[in-house]
């Protein structure tokens, strides 16, 4: 991932630039939007330092959910292995590798799709397509970079090696995939993009489907034996928080631009002539 992500980001920038070259002001649009994207990354990464009392309840709920999952990791794993015939497990396994849908949890595929949306938005002049592509890319990068560092540093052993739920070898994850269980990656990546889209756009009846897709991708890593249930809880929650944060930033800018555009239109409106008639008796 260390080499793939920078390469894909470079493809995004170069592809956007090529599409922008044929449009007046295109390069300026790309420059401004990539600048906003960089600031969004920093904003998300320093978010833990802005936590206050209002966030305490959410943190407690998340902590309790993670603790419950962690204490039952081995029981959940045993139940999944012994109940593969149940409708619930069968449904989750529809998102497992090697089915193609699991690729929506991979950074390289999400960045590729994001680049395609962004370039298409530039080529067609669609701001919504550009925001969807860029926002998904930013949400994914803001999620996957720190998550990858945490996974490699914590060094939790994956369940498929059957040595128990609490086998940790700090730093070993930097050289061994087996010790990168916490937190889940596929689910965090897909959930970040899903949460961004839901926060930024009005998806209507599609909103539950988007969240269901991301959750299914995350849980499928549990049924696959690549992650513990608590890994999925942590990863999905992390992706959701990041995606909402990035989506909120995009939404604020869109609302501000809409307000300015409305004020400008009002200021440049054509003068109006009013004719009144008054009759006195």
Over which residues does each language-model region extend?
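N-terminal secretory signal peptides that target proteins for export/translocation
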Residues: 1-3
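N-terminal targeting leaders of membrane proteins
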Residues: 7-124, 152-153, 159-180, 189-192, ...
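Interfacial segments of alpha-helical transmembrane regions
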Residues: 54, 58-60, 120-146
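Short, aromatic-rich membrane-interface segments at the entry and exit
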Residues: 55-57, 107-108, 129-131, 205-208, ...
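Alpha-helical transmembrane segments of multipass membrane proteins
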Residues: 65, 69, 142-147, 151, ...
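Membrane-water interface at transmembrane helix exits
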Residues: 77, 81, 120-121, 147-155, ...
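Small-polar-interrupted transmembrane alpha-helices in polytopic inner-membrane proteins
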Residues: 114, 138-151, 206-221
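Membrane-embedded catalytic cores of phosphoryl/pyrophosphoryl-handling enzymes
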Residues: 161-280
């Amino acid at each position: 991932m260390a080499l793939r992500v920078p390469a894909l980001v470079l493809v995004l920038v170069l592809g956007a630039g090529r599409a922008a070259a044929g449009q007046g002001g295109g390069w300026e649009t790309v420059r401004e939007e990539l600048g906003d994207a960089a600031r969004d990354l920093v904003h998300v990464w320093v978010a833990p330092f802005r936590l206050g009392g209002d966030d305490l309840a959410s943190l407690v709920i998340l902590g309790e959910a993670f603790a419950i999952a962690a204490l039952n990791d081995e029981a959940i794993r045993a139940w999944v292995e012994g109940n593969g015939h149940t409708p619930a497990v069968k449904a989750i396994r529809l998102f497992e590798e090697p089915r193609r849908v699991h690729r929506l949890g991979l950074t390289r595929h999400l960045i590729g799709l994001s680049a395609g949306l962004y370039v298409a938005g530039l080529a067609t002049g669609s701001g919504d397509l550009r925001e969807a592509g860029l926002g998904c890319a930013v949400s994914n990068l803001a999620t996957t970079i720190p998550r990858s560092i945490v996974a490699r540093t914590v060094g939790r052993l994956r369940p498929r090696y059957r040595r128990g739920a609490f086998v940790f070898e700090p730093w070993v994850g930097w050289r061994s995939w087996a010790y990168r269980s916490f937190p889940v990656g596929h689910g965090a990546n897909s959930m970040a993009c899903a949460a961004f889209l839901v926060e930024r756009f009005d998806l209507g009846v599609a909103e539950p489907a988007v969240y269901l897709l991301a959750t299914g991708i995350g849980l499928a890593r549990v049924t696959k034996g690549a992650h513990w249930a608590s890994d999925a809880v942590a990863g999905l929650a992390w992706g959701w928080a990041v995606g909402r944060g990035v989506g909120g930033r995009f939404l604020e800018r869109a609302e501000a631009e809409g307000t300015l555009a409305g004020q400008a239109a009002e200021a440049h409106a054509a003068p109006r002539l009013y004719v009144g008639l008054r009759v006195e008796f």
